[in-house]
């Protein structure tokens, strides 16, 4: 599998919006390191994008450090389809974010977009330390799990495969204390054809 890095060329792109730099993404073996840092007085973010679509299956993201990041940092591990005709961009998310509140302990989020419709997101307090999170995507069914927390969504509105790809990003909703980084390992475990 090959990762490419998002680069906005100094412009502001979503999410955020943020300035995205390719040098805020480093790949070594099966580990992707994402960074948020200040460059010439501007906060910049990093996003890695897998080179191909994988479709139904089990997506595993191993976070090599605590998910409790700076209050203004957001770590996203998700599927996204750039096709504007795709339903809600086929976005299926695992996120770690305090959303600006340093006292927020429910920093883990499992989401099937759009998040603001009832029953499409849960927030939880994750374990503090390295952990493996999974999204199992099957026809009409998605199951998320992370360090003993699990949640499932069933329905005809679960997206079918298209041209979605795995994205991993680290971005900011405001200034952070120094540079912030996250190390993630990704594995794909094969096609899932039914409900477990």
Report residues per predicted region.
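Secretory/extracellular carbohydrate-interaction modules
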Residues: 34-105
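Extracellular/lumenal carbohydrate-interaction signature centered on repeated Trp-anchored short motifs
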Residues: 48-58, 122-129, 159
């Amino acid at each position: 599998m090959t990762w490419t890095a998002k680069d906005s060329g100094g412009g502001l792109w979503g999410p955020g919006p943020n300035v995205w730099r390719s040098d805020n993404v480093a790949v070594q073996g099966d580990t992707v390191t994402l960074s948020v840092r200040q460059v010439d007085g501007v906060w910049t973010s990093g996003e890695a994008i897998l080179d191909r679509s994988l479709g139904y299956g089990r997506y595993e993201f191993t976070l090599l450090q605590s998910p409790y990041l700076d209050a203004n940092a957001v770590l996203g591990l998700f599927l996204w389809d750039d096709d504007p005709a795709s339903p809600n961009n086929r976005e299926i998310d695992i996120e770690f974010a305090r959303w600006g509140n340093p006292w927020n302990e429910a920093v883990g989020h499992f989401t099937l977009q759009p998040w603001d419709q009832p029953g499409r997101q849960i927030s939880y307090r994750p374990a503090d330390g390295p952990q493996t999170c999974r999204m199992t995507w099957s026809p009409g069914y998605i199951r998320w799990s992370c360090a003993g927390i699990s949640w499932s969504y069933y329905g005809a509105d679960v997206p079918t495969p298209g041209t979605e790809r795995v994205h991993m990003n680290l971005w900011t909703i405001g200034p952070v204390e120094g540079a912030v980084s996250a190390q993630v390992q990704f594995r794909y475990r094969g096609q899932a054809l039914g409900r477990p």
